Amino acid sequence: MSVMFDPDTAIYPFPPKPTPLSIDEKAYYREKIKRLLKERNAVMVAHYYTDPEIQQLAEETGGCISDSLEMARFGAKHPASTLLVAGVRFMGETAKILSPEKTILMPTLQAECSLDLGCPVEEFNAFCDAHPDRTVVVYANTSAAVKARADWVVTSSIAVELIDHLDSLGEKIIWAPDKHLGRYVQKQTGADILCWQGACIVHDEFKTQALTRLQEEYPDAAILVHPESPQAIVDMADAVGSTSQLIAAAKTLPHQRLIVATDRGIFYKMQQAVPDKELLEAPTAGEGATCRSCAHCPWMAMNGLQAIAEALEQEGSNHEVHVDERLRERALVPLNRMLEFAATLRG
C-alpha cells in the first residue's frame, strides 16, 4: 500500500503580513531597486500573483510578468547575469535549474507554496514506487526534488495538451500535486490518471454558494476560473485556463463585466488588457465560512519592495537560490521535455 501525505490535515505555516510602506518609502525603494538592477546586471522576473507595485516595477525595468512557463523561458534566454525572481520558492529553483550559470535571487527564500508543501518528496517517492507502470507528471508548483523524480514537468497552460499527447501513446499517468487540476485534465482528456491529493490554498477556497449569489447580482458577467479551483467552481465557468489564458479570455469574451476566480494579483495585467471592463473577485468565503488566503497567496505577498532591495544589495545565502548539482541535472530532464513540448505547440 502506498504512502500518501494528506494535505488536508497539514498545517501550513502562513507568513505574517508585510508591514505597509509609506508613499515616500515606496518611492525610495523603487529608485534603489532600479539602480541596483543596473549595477548587478540583473532583471526582474515576476509572477502574475505578485502585488501590483511589484509587477509595475518589473515592467518599468525591462523585466517579465508572466505565468510560470513564460517565467522559465524568459529567465533562461535573457542575457542578464542575475535574475531577481519575484514569486515563490519553486520558481526560483526552476530558474536555477534552467540557468545554473546565473545568480538567482529572491526577495525571500521563505516564500512557499501549499502545493509544494503538500507534496513531500519522501512520501511522493513511495507513492511513485507503488505504481511503477505509470508515467510521472508533476506540476511546476513542486520542489526540485519532486521534479527530479518526474518524467515530465508541466504548467497549467499546457497541461491538457501534454496529457492528451501521453494518453495517445497509451501511457497511464501519475499526476501531482494538484487534485483539482488533475481532475480537470482527466475530464478534458479521458486519460488514466492517478492523482496526488494536493490543493492550492487560494483556489481551494472559492465557494459555489457565494459565487452563485454574486452571479445572481451580476447576471451579465462572465465567470473566469483557474483549473486549480474545485470542480463545482469550474463547472460554473464561461472560460477555464491558466493565468495567461484567463487574460486572453478576458479580451475575447464579449462581456463587459468579468468575475475572476483566481489570485487577485492577476487583476493588474488583466485590467491592462481590458481597461474598459469591470473585474470582480470571485468570493472565497461562503455563509458562516472564513477565508485563510482571501484570494491572495500569502507567500506571494512576501515579495515586497524592501525585500527586493535587500536581495539585490545583500549578496549571500539569505536571498540566493542554490540547487544541488546532481539534483539539478535530474530535474532539468523533465523541465526540458516540457519546454520542448511547449515549443511544438507554439509552432
From Swiss-Prot:
<feature type="binding site">
    <location>
        <begin position="226"/>
        <end position="228"/>
    </location>
    <ligand>
        <name>iminosuccinate</name>
    </ligand>
</feature>
<comment type="similarity">
    <text>Belongs to the quinolinate synthase family. Type 1 subfamily.</text>
</comment>
<dbReference type="GO" id="GO:0034628">
    <property type="term" value="P:'de novo' NAD biosynthetic process from L-aspartate"/>
</dbReference>
<keyword id="KW-0479">Metal-binding</keyword>
<feature type="binding site">
    <location>
        <position position="297"/>
    </location>
    <ligand>
        <name>[4Fe-4S] cluster</name>
    </ligand>
</feature>
<feature type="binding site">
    <location>
        <position position="113"/>
    </location>
    <ligand>
        <name>[4Fe-4S] cluster</name>
    </ligand>
</feature>
<keyword id="KW-0963">Cytoplasm</keyword>
<dbReference type="GO" id="GO:0005829">
    <property type="term" value="C:cytosol"/>
</dbReference>
<dbReference type="InterPro" id="IPR003473">
    <property type="entry name" value="NadA"/>
</dbReference>
<feature type="binding site">
    <location>
        <position position="200"/>
    </location>
    <ligand>
        <name>[4Fe-4S] cluster</name>
    </ligand>
</feature>
<feature type="binding site">
    <location>
        <position position="47"/>
    </location>
    <ligand>
        <name>iminosuccinate</name>
    </ligand>
</feature>
<keyword id="KW-0808">Transferase</keyword>
<comment type="function">
    <text>Catalyzes the condensation of iminoaspartate with dihydroxyacetone phosphate to form quinolinate.</text>
</comment>
<feature type="binding site">
    <location>
        <position position="156"/>
    </location>
    <ligand>
        <name>iminosuccinate</name>
    </ligand>
</feature>
<feature type="binding site">
    <location>
        <position position="68"/>
    </location>
    <ligand>
        <name>iminosuccinate</name>
    </ligand>
</feature>
<dbReference type="GO" id="GO:0051539">
    <property type="term" value="F:4 iron, 4 sulfur cluster binding"/>
</dbReference>
<feature type="binding site">
    <location>
        <position position="243"/>
    </location>
    <ligand>
        <name>iminosuccinate</name>
    </ligand>
</feature>
<keyword id="KW-0411">Iron-sulfur</keyword>
<dbReference type="GO" id="GO:0046872">
    <property type="term" value="F:metal ion binding"/>
</dbReference>
<comment type="pathway">
    <text>Cofactor biosynthesis; NAD(+) biosynthesis; quinolinate from iminoaspartate: step 1/1.</text>
</comment>
<protein>
    <recommendedName>
        <fullName>Quinolinate synthase</fullName>
        <ecNumber>2.5.1.72</ecNumber>
    </recommendedName>
</protein>
<dbReference type="GO" id="GO:0008987">
    <property type="term" value="F:quinolinate synthetase A activity"/>
</dbReference>
<dbReference type="InterPro" id="IPR023513">
    <property type="entry name" value="Quinolinate_synth_A_type1"/>
</dbReference>
<keyword id="KW-0662">Pyridine nucleotide biosynthesis</keyword>
<dbReference type="Pfam" id="PF02445">
    <property type="entry name" value="NadA"/>
</dbReference>
<dbReference type="InterPro" id="IPR036094">
    <property type="entry name" value="NadA_sf"/>
</dbReference>
<feature type="binding site">
    <location>
        <begin position="139"/>
        <end position="141"/>
    </location>
    <ligand>
        <name>iminosuccinate</name>
    </ligand>
</feature>
<keyword id="KW-0408">Iron</keyword>
<keyword id="KW-0004">4Fe-4S</keyword>
